[in-house]
Amino acid sequence: MGMFVLLLYTFLYAGDLGHGAEKSFPVLNIAVILGRTRYITERDIRSLWTRDMSLDFDVNVVTLLVNQTDPKSIITHVCDLMSGTKIHGVVFGDDTDQEAIAQILDFVSSQTFIPILGIHGGSSMIMADKDEMSTFFQFGASIKQQATVMLNIMEEYDWHVFSVITSNFPGYRDFISFIKTTVDNSFVGWEVQNYITLDTSYTDAQTLTQLKKIHSSVILLYCSKDEATYIFEEARSLGLMGYGFVWIVPSLVTGNTDIIPYEFPSGLVSVSYDDWDYGIEARVRDGLGIITTAASAMLEKHSVIPEAKTSCYGQNERNDPPLHTLHNFMINVTWDGKDLSFTEDGYQANPKLVVLLLNMEREWEKVGKWENKSLNMKYPVWPRITASLDSDHDDNHLSIVTLEEAPFVIVENIDYLTGTCVRNTVPCRKYFRLNNSTTEGTSVKKCCKGFCIDILKKLSKTVKFTYDLYLVTNGKHGKKIKNVWNGMIGEVVYKRAVMAVGSLTINEERSVAVDFSVPFVETGISVMVSRSNGTVSPSAFLEPFSASVWVMMFVMLLLVSAMAVFIFEYFSPVGYNRNLAQGKDPHGPSFTIGKAVWLLWGLVFNNSVPVQNPKGTTSKIIVSIWAFFAVIFLASYTANLAAFMIQEEFVDQVTGLSDNKFQRPHDYSPPFRFGTVPNGSTERNIRNNYPDMHQYMVKFHQKGVQDALVSLKTGKLDAFIYDAAVLNYMAGRDEGCKLVTIGSGYIFATTGYGIALQKGSRWKRPIDLALLQFVGDGEMEELEKLWLTGICHTEKNEVMSSQLDIDNMAGVFYMLAAAMALSLITFVWEHLFYWKLRFCFTGVCTGTPGLLFSISRGIYSCIHGVHIEEKKKSPDFSFTASQTNMLKLLRASKNIANLSNLNQSQCNSPKRTSDYIQRNSLLTDMVLDKGNLTYSDNRPFQQKDIYSENTYDLAMLSANCPKDNLNNYVFQGQHPLTLNESNPNTVEVAVSAEAKVNTRPRQLWKKSVETLRQTQGSVNENGTEESKSSIKNQRFLPEDGHFSDVSEASSRATCHIDSENNNKHRKSKDNLKKRPVSAKYARECSEVELSYLKIKHGPNRDKVYTIDGDKEPSFIMDQPKYSENSPDQDDEDYPDVYQDHNDNYRKTEPLQSDRTPLHSEGRLPNNDIQYKLFSKHYNLKEKNTSMSDANDRHRQNSTHCRSCLSNMPNYTGHYTARSPYKCDDCLHTGKLYDIDEDQMLHEAANSMHSEDFYEHNWLENNALHFQKKNKLRINRQHSCDNINKPREHDLGRPPRSLSLKEKERYIQENPFAKFVIVPPEKLLGNNASLFTDSLKDSKRSKSLYPDNSSDNPFLHSYQETQKLSHGRSSSDIYKQSSLPKARNDNYLRSSIKSTTSYSSRDGRVPDDMCVSEYALPYVTSNNSVYSAPRVVNSCSNRRVFKKMPSLESDV
């Protein structure tokens, strides 16, 4: 029993808990009240709401459909509903346009604090003033919001001038106030003409009077729907409802869209809440969602839903609503992804508004939408709809279509700040389709300007019309496709536009469909190309002049000017070549064609090159004229060079549409690419005239001009064909001016732009007259300057200087590289020709005269008038008696010439002279390439036949004379030339020894022997080595008398005979000036081997020391360079006089042949005197006497005869100086030189056999040679400045006297004069001379001056580096070898090595090799045969010649 009671209690408790929990779940009751005009049932309304499981309360929807919507019925239904059910919110909608319903609902909400939503009809209409306690919300827009949309519509269509008409309906003050505030604070140029408020309670007369004040075409109306009917009726009577007037009203006037009063005009614009896209069902659902969302937010925040008022009846208490009432949460609501918020006035914050238009069918048409504060209109141009009751229509407002194409029509966006178009632009509409599948889209307001827009504005003012402008939809000018026109032409043809203004080309096809005005712009077809960066050609440095100019320049230079200069100079009486021919300036420079070309070439390019200017007056005139030409030529070249070295931009050159690049584009690589914009006059022209060209260019068509410009710049297109006016503008405005039109805008198929009008339009004539007036007044020209002229056409690009890169100068470097390569080839060919081929060209290979030799000889013969005789080979025949005698005579002459080459020991040798003649090389043999005493390669001498070339020997005697640089010559005048058959390249010249005038004396040699005798150092008495001798040593030796060196047997005359003829050729120089080292020393010196002579069976071989003359000289003369162990020569038999008693070779030092007993080395004073003795560098043995003993031997008071060297005791001059006096025996001839000296020498030689001769002299002088080996020798001073190094034995010697007329001046002015006038007491000692032999019996021959040929190119002349056959070189003073001691059975042997690189063609000793005179004593017996050295001028490069016996005198 107890258990049953417990279970029952448990069930009951659980049931109580469940019942209590169910009561605690809140319920939200919402009432939906709708008028029965709507076809909707209560079930439909309940089905709109489904339970939302996310809510914490239950929603109970209470529906009520009413038939009566008058204010009393509405209040009754709402109060009854509230009394039966606790209502938390009400959703109310009706089908009326009575704003009184909204006012009643506003009153009920303020009394019951129940939130009420007016979603449709009168409940949603505008209320002017709501109660402060009102909780009434409306699905609609406020007065301010609708006024904003109305202003945006006027701004969209640029209706800036308007008027405002209102009634006394509540809210009109708010409407007027908002309009005024917006206009005053806006950047748009609004202009409100009138604000009119009509009182509809008064008579019609007052209303009409106020309406007459309106003059604007746009009117804003604010009133109720009933009042609007009255006002429209009155306005119609005043003509304010006609064509061109626009009325804009709010939703208050429109009301129920299903009810349209008759008085409403067609074209009425209304701003209403969106009923088309926002139906009653959607509004009911959104109303329920707003209330439930707000209740949920309140329950979440306060955990309670406030109890609603249960009855409308009772005491009216005006208490403030609680702070947590439901309507406070309904202000900011977002539901189902929609923003359903409300403003404080109870209107939606973002309402969906639409723009309605009452069309011709008297139906409301949706033409615009306002959403998210943005207005989108349907029509680009507002349709001018005329009311059906209007009798007349206004045709002055035109619809005009245009096409965007700069500079004629330029489209810009509106100003974002003002929302309108700026000044100088007009509004235009651009239509955008929503998608390609439908024609629906929206129009966007744009701003248009340009050349055609300015013309349109002028026409509008002149012709008096207004217009709406819009852009063509397909962006084309107009083309007929399948009998349907598109583009602007289609708009005009199908009367959607009255006219078309833009870059519309007039053509025949279009003229059939539309009418065109007169052309206002001349245009046609042009071609645009892009500039491309060019490259500089390698030959750009030649491009300043054309090829013909360069050819003419070289022709004038080489063939005309140079030849003329040469010819006039050659035949000029004062020219170079004439002076050579007449002998006025022998050996002087000649003026050749090459020098003429070089002179003119240097003048052209202004190079400072050494040139030889002509002397002739005529040739100087030609050169002066050429110099003037060179100035102009070089200036023109320099001025134009910079332009051609700059990288010019490359532009494709096209001559026209018929150009090959257009007609045959595949002929070019890559193919030429060109195109145009389709559906235009340009394409039509090309298609009709050039079908093949059109077929090719279709694949390169461009969508527009801008796309074409981009393709040109990026290289996708090579040329763009289009209207010339457009292309010229684009080229002028292009950034960087990279785009150009060919031919500076050359036009093909000239035509013009015109305005298209409908066929038979009444506007054609007025527009034509206006356009002609613009052209005549110059207004059209001003517009063209403003719009059609670009910056690239008016402004010149600034020329910027830039560095010339390697690319700019590549051509010049290529030329230099080619010149270097050509030089290398020429260098190789020159050496190949010189070493391998030239012998064949000169005839050596064939044995006959070569081609070059024959041509050169012929030219020389023609120029100089010299007859050339071909010397034929002598036939074999037996000699007659006279011929035999002549051969003997020639043989004797050769023997005589050879005897002069013998030294003292050879003359005193017991051997016969004929032995020397046969064994040794004769003078003429050496001339005839018969070799030297010993060949340089130690080959034995090969004897040549001397009989076949006797006459040739004589000719070669003079040929060996080198050229005289001072123009002294022997062979003057014209001489016959004969060809030597044995040597085909040698020409013989007949020589005359007769003296000629115009010869010139030699100058005084500046160098003294003391300077030449510097050596390694000096050894003082203590044996210490002193420093090298300075260059400031004694430089002058006393010379002979005035003409001591001028031989009467010489073949030239002295200068004092005809000195006046030579003054112009030679100027006196200050010979004491320091000269450069290159002038003081020779450019070459032969290498002399100074060796000991060896005996044939001698067991010992001494070392051979060689002085290398090729070493480069220095200013301070270094010691000679010696080379040991030079290759020995082949042994030969020498005379016995060269061996000592023990058969040893040169055991003691031999007596120097160039010393005299009078001038021994021991005659110098003590060491404090400036003259010092130095041992000879080739004296290897110890000396037999000391230095002090040697000095004592030199003191004496006597002198000698300068000719015969005999003793003259009364001479008080310098004891070391050569005597300037002659003895009485030598003065009897009265001549400077007597040929008898040579005869005496030869007679003496013939009076004694050679063996006895040598033996006799040796026995007589043997003791003297051993005692006097240290005596000072007297040498003839050698000339030439090219002396390399002094000899040791010449150092410290006193100077010789000077010769010629400058002797006194040199002695006075020379800084070394003190050495010449040293007091005798310092030079003479007490010791007597060791020698008492007299010199009176001795005779010495003087040498001749060198006699030079007159530069005959066919005579062998010898270089400065080559030895002379009968004279001495400039370095012979170093080459005086000492004589060996007196022994029998030894032959003289010497080895000579030439330092020149020249070698004869047969590989033997060079032709120019000669033997220096090694043993030439100054003091000999009466029978001595010798030849004295002589001096040559130091200012020239003359050689020293030995005295040769006169052939004519001997014969």
Curated annotation (Swiss-Prot):
Paired cysteines (S-S): 79-312, 421-447, 428-448, 737-792
Subcellular location: Cell membrane; Postsynaptic cell membrane
Residues that, per the record, bind L-glutamate: 503, 505, 510, 681-682, 723
One Pfam family matching this protein: Lig_chan
SMART domains according to UniProt: Lig_chan-Glu_bd, PBPe
Catalysed conversion reaction: Ca(2+)(in) = Ca(2+)(out); Na(+)(in) = Na(+)(out); K(+)(in) = K(+)(out)
Glycosylation sites recorded in the entry for this protein: 67, 332, 372, 435-436, 533, 679
TM stretches of this protein: 548-568, 618-637, 809-829
Annotated spans, Disordered: 1011-1080, 1100-1165
Topological domains, Extracellular: 21-547, 638-808
Residues involved in Zn(2+) binding: 120, 258, 274
Membrane-related topology note: Multi-pass membrane protein
Keywords: Calcium, Cell membrane, Disulfide bond, Glycoprotein, Ion channel, Ion transport, Ligand-gated ion channel, Magnesium, Membrane, Metal-binding, Postsynaptic cell membrane, Receptor, Signal, Synapse, Transmembrane, Transmembrane helix, Transport, Zinc
Intramembrane annotation, residue ranges: 593-612
Sequence ranges of Basic and acidic residues compositional bias: 1055-1073, 1100-1113, 1138-1149
Bias (Polar residues): 1011-1022
Primary location class: membrane
Coiled coil: none
A GO molecular-function descriptor: transmitter-gated monoatomic ion channel activity involved in regulation of postsynaptic membrane potential
PANTHER family in alphabetical order: IONOTROPIC GLUTAMATE RECEPTOR
Domain remark in the UniProt entry: Contains an N-terminal domain, a ligand-binding domain and a transmembrane domain. Agonist binding to the extracellular ligand-binding domains triggers channel gating. A hydrophobic region that gives rise to the prediction of a transmembrane span does not cross the membrane, but is part of a discontinuously helical region that dips into the membrane and is probably part of the pore and of the selectivity filter.
Main function: Component of N-methyl-D-aspartate (NMDA) receptors (NMDARs) that function as heterotetrameric, ligand-gated cation channels with high calcium permeability and voltage-dependent block by Mg(2+). MDARs participate in synaptic plasticity. Channel activation requires binding of the neurotransmitter L-glutamate to the GluN2 subunit, glycine binding to the GluN1 subunit, plus membrane depolarization to eliminate channel inhibition by Mg(2+). NMDARs mediate simultaneously the potasium efflux and the influx of calcium and sodium.
Family label: Belongs to the glutamate-gated ion channel (TC 1.A.10.1) family.
Protein name: Glutamate receptor ionotropic, NMDA 2A
Lineage of the organism: Eukaryota, Metazoa, Chordata, Craniata, Vertebrata
Gene name in the database record: grin2a
